[in-house]
Swiss-Prot record:
It comes from the Bacteria. It is found in: Cell outer membrane. The gene is lolB. This is Outer-membrane lipoprotein LolB. Residues 1-21 form the signal peptide.
C-alpha cells in the first residue's frame, strides 16, 4: 500500500520532532558537570561572604543548654560562653539552680579552670581536670571557632544550601571529631549557630544556643 505524499512528509516531520525531543531530554554529562560546578561555586561564594561577616564579630556572648552524653555518663547544664577580649574566652557551666560547676578561661598560652569546689587549675592541670570531668581531650583552641560556626584548622567541610557550615571533620591528638550544625539563628546577621553537636567516638556534646548578644 502506497502512503500518500502528504502523509509521508508528515511522518518524517513527526519523526524529526521526536528525535529532537529525545535529544533535549537526554542528560549531557558535560552540562551536568557544569551545573554541579556552578552550584559548588555558588555555595563557595555564599560561604566566603558569610565567613567574612562572622570573622568581624568580637566581644560577643551566648548562652543556652549544654548536654554531655557517653556510655557511662550523662550531664546536663546551662552554659554561658563569652569573648571577653580579642583572645580571651570564658565558658561557665551552671547546674540547674544556677551554681557554677566549671569556670573556664582560655587565653593564648594559658588555660585556667575553677571547679565547683573553688579549686583552681592552670594549663596542663586544667586540661587534665577537664578530661576527668568530661572524659574528653577537648580541643579548646578550636572551640571558639566552632561555636561561631567557623571551621578553625579543619579542612574537611560540608555546607548547607545557605552557604553556612553543616559539618566539620577534624583530627586532634589521634581522635576523630565530627561537628554538625543542626540549625542556625536566621534572624541574626550574620546567621549564628542555634544547635551544635560535637561528637568524638561514643562521646557527644550538644549545645543549644538560646540567644546571642554583641557588645
Amino acid at each position: 500500500m502506497l502512503i500518500p505524499k502528504k502523509y509521508y512528509l508528515l511522518i518524517i516531520l513527526l519523526s524529526n520532532c521526536l528525535l529532537a525531543s529525545c535529544s533535549i531530554n537526554t542528560p549531557n554529562p558535560s552540562n551536568i558537570a557544569l551545573m554541579q560546578l556552578t552550584r559548588e561555586n555558588n555555595y563557595n561564594l555564599k560561604w566566603h561572604s558569610h565567613k567574612y561577616l562572622v570573622k568581624k564579630i568580637n566581644h560577643y556572648r551566648t548562652n543556652g543548654l549544654f548536654a554531655y552524653l557517653s556510655r557511662n555518663k550523662i550531664t546536663y547544664a546551662n552554659f554561658n560562653w563569652q569573648q571577653i577580649s580579642t583572645n580571651h574566652y570564658r565558658l561557665v557551666l551552671l547546674n540547674m539552680i544556677g551554681n557554677a560547676k566549671i569556670d573556664l578561661h582560655i587565653l593564648p598560652g594559658l588555660v585556667k579552670l575553677i571547679d565547683f569546689q573553688g579549686q583552681s587549675y592552670l594549663n596542663e592541670e586544667a586540661l587534665a581536670r577537664i578530661k576527668i570531668l568530661l572524659g574528653l581531650d577537648l580541643p579548646l583552641n578550636e572551640l571558639h571557632e566552632w561555636i561561631l560556626g567557623l571551621p578553625g584548622q579543619a579542612t574537611n567541610l560540608t555546607f548547607n544550601q545557605q552557604g553556612y557550615l553543616h559539618k566539620i571533620s577534624y583530627h586532634y591528638h589521634g581522635q576523630h571529631w565530627n561537628i554538625t550544625y543542626k540549625s542556625y539563628h536566621e534572624d541574626k546577621i550574620p546567621a549564628l549557630p542555634d544547635c551544635i553537636e560535637i561528637r568524638q567516638d561514643n562521646n557527644l556534646i550538644k549545645l543549644k544556643m538560646n540567644e546571642w548578644s554583641m557588645s
